[in-house]
Amino acid sequence: MTHTEVVCAVVVTHRRRELLATSLDAVVSQDRKPDHLIVVDNDNDPQVRELVTGQPVPSTYLGSRRNLGGAGGFALGMLHALALGADWIWLADDDGRPADTTVLSTLLSCAHTHSLAEVSPMVCNLDDPQRLAFPLRRGLVWRRLTSELRTDSSSSSGDLLPGIASLFNGALFRADTVDAVGVPDLRLFVRGDEVELHRRLVRSGLPFGTCLTASYLHPCGTDEFKPILGGRMHTQYPDDETKRFFTYRNRGYLLSQPGLRKLLPQEWLRFGWYFLVSRRDLAGLREWIRLRRLGRRERFQR
C-alpha cells in the first residue's frame, strides 16, 4: 500500500487577527491542501481560536499565555506537527501568504524531484512581487529581484537555487530534517532565529534550496538594510530600538557559532563603517558592541 504523505501547516501569530485570516485563507485554499493546520497564537486570543477552529481543514489551536516569539512559536508548532505524525511541515506567518494556490504542490514536487530535505519559495515583496521582500546576499553581491535569483540557478531544470533558503516564510521541511537539525532556538525570541536554523541546516550537509517557481508574499523588509560603500555592501539598522536590541544581541550570538565565524571581519567592517562614517554615531557603535557582546556571552535576558 502506498503511503500518503501527511503535510502539517504551522502558522505563528501575535495580535494580527485580520492579517492572519488572509494568510489562513491562502494556506487552506491550496490545490494540495495541508492535511492539518496548526496555529500558535502568542496572545491566546479567543477570537483567534474561533477563526482557527472554523477553517475547512482539520485544525489545532495552540494558545500561549506567554509570548514565545517567532522562534518559540515555530518550535512549539513544529514539535506538535511531529507528534501528529507529519511527514512534511509547512511554515507560514500571519503577515505573509502563499502567492497562489499552487505553492504547496510546487514545493512538494521540487523537493521530490531534487531529493531535498527542505525547500523554500522565493519570498517576494507583497506590493511588488517582482522584487524580493528581503535582500539576499550572494557572496558580496546583494540580490533584490526575483529575476536575479533565477540567473543564479545551477539546476538543469532551472527551478532550484541550491544551498540557500529563506526559512519560516513558506518553508517546507521533511520531518526527518527536523530530527536532524532541531527546531528554532527559543532564546532568540525574534530576529536571527531563521539564520541560526539555516546555519544548522548548512552544517548538517542535507540538501536544501529555494524553489524558483514558487513565491510567498511578505511585506517589504528592505528598509532596514542601509547601503554603504556605494551600495556594494549593506548594514542592518532597524529604526525601532527594540528591534535593534534583538537584532544586534542575537547577531552577537550567531556570529560566535561554527559556520558563521568567518563573517566576523566583514561584520566589523560593515558596522564600523556605517556608524562611524555614514552616521558619525560613536554612541551607536558602542551600543552595537555592547549588544553583540551580550549575545556572544549568551546573556539572553530580555
Swiss-Prot record:
Pathway: Cell wall biogenesis; cell wall polysaccharide biosynthesis. GO terms for biological process: capsule polysaccharide biosynthetic process; cell wall macromolecule biosynthetic process; cell wall organization. One of its GO terms (molecular function) is glycosyltransferase activity. It is found in: Cell membrane; Secreted, Cell wall. The keyword Ribonucleoprotein does not apply. It comes from the Bacteria. Gene3D superfamilies: 3.90.550.60. InterPro entries: Glyco_trans_2-like, Nucleotide-diphossugar_trans. It is an enzyme of class 2 (transferase). Its main location: membrane. It holds the Pfam family Glycos_transf_2. It catalyses: alpha-L-rhamnosyl-(1->3)-N-acetyl-alpha-D-glucosaminyl-diphospho-trans,octa-cis-decaprenol + 2 UDP-alpha-D-galactofuranose = beta-D-galactofuranosyl-(1->5)-beta-D-galactofuranosyl-(1->4)-alpha-L-rhamnosyl-(1->3)-N-acetyl-alpha-D-glucosaminyl-diphospho-trans,octa-cis-decaprenol + 2 UDP + 2 H(+). Belongs to the glycosyltransferase 2 family. Involved in the biosynthesis of the arabinogalactan (AG) region of the mycolylarabinogalactan-peptidoglycan (mAGP) complex, an essential component of the mycobacterial cell wall. Catalyzes the transfer of the first two galactofuranosyl (Galf) units from UDP-galactofuranose (UDP-Galf) onto the rhamnosyl-GlcNAc-diphospho-decaprenol (Rha-GlcNAc-PP-C50) acceptor, yielding galactofuranosyl-galactofuranosyl-rhamnosyl-GlcNAc-diphospho-decaprenol (Galf-Galf-Rha-GlcNAc-PP-C50). Thus, GlfT1 is the initiator of galactan synthesis, while GlfT2 continues with the subsequent polymerization events. This is Galactofuranosyltransferase GlfT1.
